[in-house]
């Protein structure tokens, strides 16, 4: 009888955790998948970047990368983009997690290897325009190195042409690269002037130590660089996941899901 009760409680806990995940993720997933508002916002971000690009190219005194401090004025221009929810739309994977009541990273590699992610709205027009103006395109992603071929295939299937003589797709773990993207931005900055950057997470723009920090610290850093937003830095919305969420739980990923939900509820500001 005792063993049966223990087994029942384990099943109940798993069911509750799955329900909590669905509760937290379903509206965000539907917003990205189905809302006209999400589509319009993404188009707006990339159209704004298209409008800004000529003036940014002409002003060689500016770099978009905080790692690039000097001697960049005469280097050829480049842009850096994150991949997931910035260039490639993986919202179908989020929908799978909800329907199967599972959690990332379960099924993630398999999804990537299907090579069927679509472009985020607006990004194709930007990539085409930047290429037309002679701007090199680099993707700095925290997809792991084993997914490089699948990611490249997916992008090529969507029409992107890898034309630089050097690696344009810089993956986590490809070399001695962790999740902090500053070393990969610095690598690009050795040979190019970085004129714009795009992402859906603060770490796509700043050092990881500032990104993986409290919500208050992240907001302070964001405000510190307010002159960059909309000119050189372009943020895509991602209500599904990111370090904005992790900062609320203090990056304590092992905290039980029920406790994580309560922490998030407690963080709500009702004025």
Predicted regions and their residues:
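Sec-exported extracytoplasmic/periplasmic mature domains
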Residues: 54, 58, 93, 128-136, ...
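Active-site neighborhood of HAD-like aspartate-dependent phosphohydrolases
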Residues: 76, 87-118, 132
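Short, acidic loop-to-helix structural element flanking the phosphoryl-transfer center
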Residues: 109-138, 145-146
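Surface-exposed patches in mature extracellular/periplasmic domains of secreted proteins
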Residues: 57-69, 137-142, 164-167
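Non-catalytic pre-domain segments flanking phosphatase-related domains
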Residues: 17-81, 250-271
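Bacterial Sec-dependent N-terminal signal peptides
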Residues: 1-26
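C-terminal cap/substrate-recognition subdomain and adjoining C-terminal extension
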Residues: 47, 148-271
């Amino acid at each position: 009888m005792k063993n049966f009760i223990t087994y029942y409680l384990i099943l109940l806990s798993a069911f509750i955790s799955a329900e909590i995940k669905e509760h937290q993720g379903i509206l965000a997933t539907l917003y990205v998948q189905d809302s006209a508002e999400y589509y319009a916002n993404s188009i707006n971000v990339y159209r704004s970047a298209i409008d800004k690009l000529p003036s940014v190219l002409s002003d060689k005194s500016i770099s978009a990368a905080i790692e690039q401090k000097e001697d960049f004025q005469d280097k050829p221009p480049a842009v850096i983009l994150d991949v997931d929810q910035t260039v490639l739309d993986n919202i179908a994977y989020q929908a799978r997690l909800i329907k199967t009541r599972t959690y990332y990273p379960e099924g993630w590699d398999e999804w990537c290897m299907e090579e069927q992610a679509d472009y985020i709205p607006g990004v194709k027009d930007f990539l085409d325009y930047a290429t037309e103006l002679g701007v090199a395109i680099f993707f700095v992603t925290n997809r792991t190195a084993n997914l490089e071929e699948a990611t490249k295939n997916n992008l090529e299937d969507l029409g992107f042409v890898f034309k630089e003589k050097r690696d344009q797709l810089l993956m986590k773990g490809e070399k001695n690269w962790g999740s902090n993207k500053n070393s990969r931005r610095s690598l690009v900055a050795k040979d190019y002037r970085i004129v714009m950057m795009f992402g859906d997470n603060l770490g796509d723009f700043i050092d990881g130590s500032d990104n993986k920090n409290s919500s208050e610290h992240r907001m302070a850093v964001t405000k510190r660089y307010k002159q960059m937003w909309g000119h050189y830095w372009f943020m895509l919305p991602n209500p599904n996941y990111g370090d904005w969420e992790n900062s609320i739980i203090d990056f304590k990923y092992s905290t039980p899901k029920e406790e994580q939900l309560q922490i998030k509820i407690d963080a709500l500001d009702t004025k």
